[in-house]
């Protein structure tokens, strides 16, 4: 494949200093998880352009080789415009249209290390130039068992205001922006990259299974791509999210909004479209070609959109989600949590019901919800072993199956946040040696937060906690916060020696991507 050379800003290779030499330490009291057990520092972003929603992967062939990507959005537009409230007012709508029409307003920043995080090289995507689009947002990264690194994004909005030729909805999102999600591959540890390849291009119904009716409006059905890898088979998957049309539904044309200039349309009302899905596509040749697009739920057992988990190992694509419809012949009462296994890249699933959490583990009152979807991880060392994590108030409980979902262990307490805190940015993954790791942000009532990690070395029976953040992050800073978009997730990876975390943090005075590293010996 044709290669392009990663652009290194000023050919920079930097030596990162300990955090204490960069930022004054907080006077926080001692907390579980000694600060000295983790290493952390600001990696991506600056006062002009933030960096959020980061991804981290290590190279299985060379664990000292890691890639981090982040969505890097201008904090102030070239004309000096700063963020305003994102609401449905006329002015906010017009401001959003203006923001999205700025070329290179959002890009994917890339950091690569080949010495375990001592030094890094920095570059940015070439997707915007290659496809002639404004933005490379919703960044992601990945790594394959053959040592290949991957990076990609949602590359969209025809250059300048071209993405708005088909109009926009109230709120400012283009109806037909152009673009989609794309991926590039590196076979030399991130030194050079292939040209990007479309995975979920917009307006491409021919790529979907014939029984699916995806709704092609705005960035649906390709929003927020996520990368999944089956290390035993080398299969890689990329997801996208968005709406769908009911079986017999006919989508009516958008209706002009009289409060907006020509080209501005009313938002669609609830019920005008069908359900919301996570769409998934598989590649068996390292991202060169891709198969038919399916969903992570099914017509027989529909999900609720966001909130489910996806993982893969030993040729099994596995999903977990909440449904209101019990699988056929299950005799279950729903809403319930289902576990699905696909042997054909998501074309079809076999389902099993996961027992509900016992009543004595549930809080007496719901309290603050936080982000409480079910997490799922497949163990690459043992076929049929999977872990799920469920939130019950201030606690997370983990259950394990050793037989492909037929039976599940009793829930084990894995994490707990303070009484007034909620969970955010949760993640869970197995290491190549079968060690189970988890991360989460603990978010406090004043919107400050810190990052935590948890590890089980005995198959999910006992857990040990290490605080990754050395201090609590200030709350979101609107004028230096990725233009008020770009903090939907944090991610982790776990090798045989270290747990790695990347997350958006505001301690530097802007939303930047911070990198954390914890030796497994610390747990």
Segments (PLM) and residue ranges:
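Bacterial N-terminal signal peptides that target proteins for export
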Residues: 1-11
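Bacterial N-terminal signal peptides
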Residues: 9-21
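C-terminal PAP-associated
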Residues: 25-523
């Amino acid at each position: 494949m044709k290669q392009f050379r990663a652009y290194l800003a000023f050919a920079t290779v930097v030596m990162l200093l300990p955090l204490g030499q960069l930022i004054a330490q907080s006077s926080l009291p001692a907390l579980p998880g000694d600060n000295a057990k983790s290493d952390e520092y600001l990696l991506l972003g600056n006062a002009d352009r933030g960096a959020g929603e980061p991804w981290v992967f290590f190279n299985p062939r060379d664990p000292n080789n890691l890639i981090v990507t982040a969505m890097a959005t201008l904090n102030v537009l070239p004309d000096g415009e700063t963020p305003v409230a994102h609401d449905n007012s006329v002015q906010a709508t017009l401001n959003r249209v203006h923001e999205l029409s700025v070329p290179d307003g959002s890009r994917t920043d890339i950091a690569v290390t080949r010495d375990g995080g001592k030094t890094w090289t920095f570059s940015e995507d070439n997707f915007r130039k290659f496809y002639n689009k404004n933005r490379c947002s919703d960044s992601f990264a990945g790594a394959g068992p053959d040592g290949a690194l991957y990076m990609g994004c949602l590359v969209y909005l025809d250059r300048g205001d071209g993405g708005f030729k088909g109009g926009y909805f109230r709120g400012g999102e283009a109806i037909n922006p152009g673009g989609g999600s794309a991926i590039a591959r590196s076979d030399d540890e991130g030194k050079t990259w292939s040209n990007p390849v479309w995975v979920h291009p917009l307006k491409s119904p021919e790529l979907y299974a014939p029984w699916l009716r995806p709704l092609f409006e705005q960035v649906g059905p390709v929003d927020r791509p996520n990368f999944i890898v089956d290390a035993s088979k080398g299969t890689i998957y990329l997801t996208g999210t968005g709406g769908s049309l009911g079986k017999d539904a006919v989508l009516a044309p958008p209706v002009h909004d009289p409060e907006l200039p020509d080209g501005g349309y009313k938002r669609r009302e609830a019920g005008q479209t069908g359900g919301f899905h996570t769409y998934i596509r598989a590649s068996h040749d390292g991202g060169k070609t891709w198969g038919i697009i399916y969903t992570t739920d099914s017509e027989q057992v529909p999900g609720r959109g966001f909130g489910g988990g996806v993982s893969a190992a030993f040729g099994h694509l596995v999903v977990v989600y909440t449904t209101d419809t019990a699988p056929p012949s299950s005799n279950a009462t729903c809403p319930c949590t289902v576990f699905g296994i696909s042997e054909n890249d998501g074309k079809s699933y076999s389902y099993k019901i996961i027992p509900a959490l016992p009543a004595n583990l549930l809080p007496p009152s719901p309290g603050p919800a936080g982000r409480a979807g079910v997490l799922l991880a497949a163990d690459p060392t043992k076929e049929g072993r999977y872990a799920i994590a469920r939130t019950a108030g201030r606690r997370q409980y983990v259950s394990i199956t050793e037989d492909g979902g037929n039976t599940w262990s009793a829930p084990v307490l894995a994490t707990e946040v303070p009484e007034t805190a909620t969970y955010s940015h949760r993640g869970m993954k197995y290491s190549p040696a079968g060690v189970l790791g988890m991360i989460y942000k603990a978010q406090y009532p004043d919107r400050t937060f810190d990052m935590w990690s948890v590890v089980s070395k005995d198959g999910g029976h006992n857990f040990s906690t290490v605080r990754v953040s050395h201090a609590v992050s200030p709350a979101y800073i609107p004028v230096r916060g990725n233009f008020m978009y770009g903090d939907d997730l944090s991610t982790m990876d776990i090798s045989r020696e270290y747990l790695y975390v990347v997350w958006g943090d505001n301690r530097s005075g802007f939303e930047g991507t911070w990198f954390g590293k914890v030796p497994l010996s610390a747990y």
